[in-house]
Amino acid sequence: KTGYSVGIYGENSNVTNNASKIIQVGKDGIGVYIAGAGNVAENYGIINGVGDNAKGIFATDNSIVRNYGTINMTGDNVMGIAGQNGAQIYNDANGVINVTGNDVTGIYLSGDNTKLINNGVINISGTGMGISYTPTVELSNINDTTGTTIGSTSKQYQLPDMPTLVNRGEININVGGNFNYDGIRVI
C-alpha cells in the first residue's frame, strides 16, 4: 500500500461535481476532499466507490459539504460522507447515500463544532450505522429531519471515547514460567 487516491481535491477552494458527472473511487480512496474554513464541496452528480475503507466525501477544518446527488459506496468500512473538525454537512432532500458492506457508515462526524443537517435518504445494506458520531460532537449539532435511514442497525450512534490508561507507578507481574506473551504489546 503506497497511499490513497482522491477524485477531486479542494483545499482553500470550492469544488463541484456537476449533475450527470460521475466520480469513481477505489479501495482506501476519497471521491471528494475539501478543507479550509468556508470552502464548499457540492455534489450534484454521482460518486461511486468500490473497495474497503473508501469515502465518498471527506470534509475537514470548517469546510462545507452539500450533497444534492447520489453517493454509492460498496465495501467494508466505507463511509458516504465523513466530516471532522468543524465541518458542516448538508444532505439535501434529493441527496441519497447508499452504503453496502460490513461496518459501513452513511455519515460520520467527529470533532468540535462539526454539524449535520440530513434532509435526504441514507440506505444501509449489510451492517453499520446511518449516522455515527464521536463524543466530541454535540448532539444538538445533528439535525436529522427525514428519519428515512434504512438499515438493520441504529440510525444514530455515539461512538465511545477511547480509554486512556496512565501508569505513574510500578506494575509487577509474577506468573511463573507459564505465561503466554502472544499478542501482548507494551509501550
Predicted regions and their residues:
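Beta-strand-rich solenoid/repeat architectures in extracellular/passenger domains
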Residues: K1-S5, N14-D28, G38-N53, I64-N77, ...
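General N-terminal targeting signals
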Residues: Y133-P135
